[in-house]
Structures are given as C-alpha cells and as structure tokens.
C-alpha cells in the first residue's frame, strides 16, 4: 500500500551566461536576450497542469528548489509572480524551504534582496573553487574575489541559510589545494557545504577533451582530510557530498533521496508523484529545449511514465 510522502516543487531555469566544459545539466548559453516573461508565464501554465495531476489539492508544499542553468539571471519579480499564484492553489508549509541557485559571476545586490523579499530563504552559490587557477580550468566566469563578494552580498540581502557548492579532485589538483578551498569556504561561515567530487560526464567538452585528473591516491587523500576538517568545524555529513551545520540539512534534497514527491516545472524538469487514489506512481519529464517548451502545450509535450 502506498503512503503519502512530503511534496516539493522543482523549477528549472535553463539559461546560463556560459556553458561550462564539465556541465551535463540542461543548460543553454544565452546568445543575446532570453524571453524571461514568456518563460515565467509558461512555468505557471506548467504548474497548473501538474496541479491537475496531483489529485489531493490539500497537500502542503514543503520545499521549492530553483535550479538551472543560472536562475540568478531572472528578476525577483518573476519569482514573486510565480509564488503568489502558486500559493493561491497550494498551501506553503510554515517552515517551507525555498532555494535558488546563483552564479557568483552574476551577482546583483538589488536582485538578491528582491529574491529574499519574494520569499526565497536559502541560496546556493556555485563557487566550485576559491583558486583562480582552477576556476579558469573549469571555464567559470567568476573569480575568487567574486565568490567571496557573492557570499557577502547574500548575507547583506538577509540570507542566513547559505550553501556553497565546492568541487574537489579538480584537474591536477593537489591535496593541499583542495583542503585550502575547504578552509576558505568554512571561513565564510556558510550553513551548508556541498562538497562534490569532480567527474567527467558524457556529452560535455571535457568528455571529448579530458583534462588530467589527480591520481586515485590523491583523491582518496583529499576526501579523507576534507571530511575530517568539515567534521572538526561541526559540519555534519548526511549524504556523500552534503555537509550541514546546526541542522541546516537541505530538506529538498533529502526529499529526493527519501523517494518523496516533487512537481517538476520548466524545460527539462522531472517530477515524481504518488497518486494514492489510483495506487500508482508517475514520473513526468518536460521538453529540454526552451523554445520547444515555450511554444507547445505543456500537457501534450510532457512525457508520462507509470512506475
């Protein structure tokens, strides 16, 4: 017999300033402008379609995650528009977690304040490294100084729940360099660190032109020393790459790992729903290309799969 799990919402923003050579996410480099208003309206249409699939409209949203791409390219008004309308259909839980991913190379203090004012209460900054040498190897558009500034701007905007994405095992990275990245990250007093091992994925530039990676022994040494440092500074590991202070675990990610339900809206977004009245699970998958997503009826373009 199926049980009703917690409900989350994933919103995908597909555009980015520059496609990184290691990125295998559904992201599309901006060439000139992009249709933010049209896309935002389509997200709401998409939400209404998913709402009809939901069945029980009395379920509360426990978390929202805005990923990409680079969601911080969008205005705060766009998210205020969405949240206001979504709230008219689904109740937000009293302690809802609303996360936005942001690129340190696309930081705007007014925009960050607008995100906070719109109800976003958690920000995830894609720092990846505090060493300009490695940032250059990764094709990132920001510098170490930009990364530190983005953290300061987020705090000034009102964010207390801040996640830093940091990679380790970068091309030709030493144990000392990886540990130094963590040390600087911890100095910034984030509430959460996502410490990922760098991997080369198919359909990326690095897959066709692979850089030289650290040996297995070095990578093992990085992980051993890194996890020890994080533990020393009261970061509790609750998933292989996730470390939180003061019970600031990401509810949204935990809901994924716990086989919870999530509505997925936006180009390339995936969703999973438990339909108790039909005793079945369904998965949804939206068109990856933004133009195809915006120019077709959402319901007819959505792929459905029962599991």
Regions found by a protein language model. Give the residues of each.
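C-terminal scaffold of the Radical SAM
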Residues: 4-6, 27-53, 59-307
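Short active-site neighborhood of thiol/selenol oxidoreductases, capturing the structured segment around
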Residues: 9-13
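Local cysteine-cluster metal-coordination motifs and their immediate loop/turn environment
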Residues: 14-27
């Amino acid at each position: 017999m199926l049980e009703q799990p917690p409900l989350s919402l994933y919103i995908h923003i597909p555009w980015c300033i520059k496609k990184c050579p290691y990125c295998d996410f559904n992201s599309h480099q901006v060439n000139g402008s992009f249709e933010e208003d049209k896309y935002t309206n389509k997200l709401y249409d998409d939400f209404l379609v998913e709402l009809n699939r939901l069945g029980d409209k009395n379920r509360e949203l426990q978390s929202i995650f805005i990923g990409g791409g680079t969601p911080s390219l969008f205005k705060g008004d766009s998210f205020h528009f969405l949240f206001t309308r979504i709230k008219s259909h689904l109740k937000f839980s009293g302690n809802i977690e609303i996360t936005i991913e942001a690129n340190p190379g696309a930081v705007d203090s007014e925009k960050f304040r607008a995100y906070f004012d719109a109800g976003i209460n958690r920000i995830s900054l894609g720092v990846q490294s505090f060493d300009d040498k490695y940032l250059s190897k990764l094709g990132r558009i920001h510098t170490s100084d930009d990364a530190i500034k983005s953290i300061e701007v987020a705090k000034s905007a009102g964010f207390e729940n801040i996640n830093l994405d940091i990679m380790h095992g970068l091309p030709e990275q030493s144990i000392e360099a990886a540990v130094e990245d963590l040390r600087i990250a911890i100095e910034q007093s984030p509430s959460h660190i996502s410490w990922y091992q760098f991997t080369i994925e198919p359909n990326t530039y690095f897959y066709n032109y692979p850089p030289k990676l650290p040996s297995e022994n070095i990578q093992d040494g990085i992980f051993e020393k890194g996890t020890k440092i994080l533990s020393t500074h009261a970061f509790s590991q609750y998933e292989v790459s996730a470390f939180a202070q003061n019970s600031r675990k990401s509810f949204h990610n935990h809901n994924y790992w716990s086989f919870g339900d999530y509505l997925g809206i936006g180009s390339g977004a995936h969703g999973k729903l438990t339909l108790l009245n039909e005793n079945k699970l369904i998965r949804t998958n939206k068109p990856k290309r933004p133009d195809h997503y915006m120019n077709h009826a959402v319901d007819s373009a959505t792929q459905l799969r029962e599991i």
